């Protein structure tokens, strides 16, 4: 590693990443996920291997992790169906009986359809005795419109209640307005042309929204405009006021409303960095927050975990892989490391 002028020069990897802008590019194989469809997939062999792993002498946890963390979610669903046909037993229930602790939680999450997993996490967040508004924002603000629609449909089917009804009964004020707007969708799509006049109107509207009676102005701006437009609004707001929009949120809002708006602003500005921050926070706790680690690594491993890894390394000076190695112990370490995939030097 070279040193220039008394300062440590950036590593070759860091320099390349800074020029690539990995968070906004698609890799050569068409995804920024760490987990991709397994090319030599044999559903029969995988189902047989899992059966041997739980019926042999002792549970072969390594085999279970190896199969489930190297197959796409679609392939895992095919394995589950094959296992059911082969044994007349439910794979999730069989593995649940064989495993325990955080490894059990990881395996259960890996085997659930995406929408079912999200619906359960959203329900838990809305019904939590302590505030879990950040989880609700994460799910409602980072899923694609089709993913969110499917999640809400599963929510209604599984819990016999609309998610919007739970939001209405469990929240209030601007937080309720914000979550309802996100759940109902309606964010416009980017046409490729930035409307500078509308951006200026939004900036002025946010500046005028000083008192409690005007707080609702923030909701349509944050939930109906596309991210490209909002980034322009954030920039113009700072130029007009000399204050970052996040500072205005901290000054004007409190409690869950503040948490929700700050989280949403972070998602809008840089979604991979938003997730990197959440992972770092989960790893800094006295006991790692496994619920957060499991949810993010599993939900993003097939979409943009490479981007999240790059943002994590850039901001915190240490790779996500090494951070997981240092903080996570026990059987679940190998599973989370497999989802993370590799070291970033």
From Swiss-Prot:
Q: Which Gene3D superfamilies match?
A: Annexin
Q: Which domain of life is it from?
A: Eukaryota
One GO molecular function term?
A: phosphatidylserine binding
First and last residues of every Annexin repeat = 41-112, 113-184, 197-266, 270-341
**Stored Pfam families:** Annexin (PF00191)
- Disulfide bonds, paired cysteine numbers: none
Q: Which UniProt keywords apply?
A: Annexin, Receptor, Repeat
- Tissues where the protein occurs: Expressed in the stratified squamous skin epithelium, but not in epithelia of other types (at protein level).
For biological process, the GO terms are: cell-cell adhesion
Gene Ontology CC terms: cell surface; cytoplasm; cytosol; nucleus; plasma membrane; synapse; vesicle membrane
Show the InterPro entries listed in the entry. Annexin, Annexin_repeat, Annexin_repeat_CS, Annexin_sf, ANX9
Repeat keyword on record: yes
What SUPFAM superfamilies does this protein's entry cite? Answer: Annexin
Q: How does it assemble?
A: Homodimer.
- Known role: Low affinity receptor for acetylcholine known to be targeted by disease-causing pemphigus vulgaris antibodies in keratinocytes.
Into which family does the record put it? Belongs to the annexin family.
- Protein's name in the database: Annexin A9
Q: Which organism is it from?
A: Homo sapiens (Human)
């Amino acid at each position: 590693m070279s040193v220039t002028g008394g300062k440590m020069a950036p590593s070759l990897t860091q320099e390349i990443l800074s020029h690539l802008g990995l968070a906004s590019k698609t890799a050569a194989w068409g995804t920024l996920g760490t987990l991709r469809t397994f090319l030599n997939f044999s559903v029969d062999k995988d189902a047989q291997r899992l059966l041997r792993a739980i019926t042999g002498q002792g549970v072969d946890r390594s085999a279970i992790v190896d199969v489930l963390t190297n197959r796409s979610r679609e392939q895992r669903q095919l394995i589950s169906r094959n296992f059911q046909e082969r044994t007349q037993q439910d794979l999730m229930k069989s593995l649940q009986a064989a495993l325990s602790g955080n490894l059990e939680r990881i395996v259960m999450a890996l085997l659930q359809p995406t929408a079912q997993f999200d619906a359960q996490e959203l329900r838990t967040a809305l019904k939590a005795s302590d505030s879990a508004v950040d989880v609700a924002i994460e799910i409602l603000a980072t899923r694609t419109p089709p993913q969110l629609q499917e999640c809400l449909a599963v929510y209604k089917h599984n819990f016999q209640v609309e998610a919007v009804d739970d939001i209405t009964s469990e929240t209030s004020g601007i937080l309720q307005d914000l979550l309802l707007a996100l759940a109902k969708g309606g964010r416009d799509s980017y046409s490729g042309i930035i409307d500078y006049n509308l951006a200026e109107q939004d900036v002025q509207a946010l500046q005028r929204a000083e008192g409690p009676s005007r707080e609702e102005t923030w909701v349509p701006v944050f939930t109906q405009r596309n991210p490209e437009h909002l980034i322009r609004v954030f920039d113009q707001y700072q130029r007009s006021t000399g204050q970052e929009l996040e500072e205005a949120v901290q000054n004007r809002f409190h409690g869950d409303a503040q948490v929700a708006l700050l989280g949403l602003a972070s998602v809008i500005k840089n979604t991979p960095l938003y997730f990197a921050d959440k992972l770092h926070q989960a790893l800094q706790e006295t006991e790692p927050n496994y619920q957060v680690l499991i949810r993010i690594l599993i939900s993003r491993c097939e979409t943009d975990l490479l981007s999240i890894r790059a943002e994590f390394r850039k901001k915190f000076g240490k790779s996500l892989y090494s951070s997981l190695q240092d903080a996570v112990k026990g059987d679940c370490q190998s599973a989370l490391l497999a989802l993370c995939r590799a070291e970033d030097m």
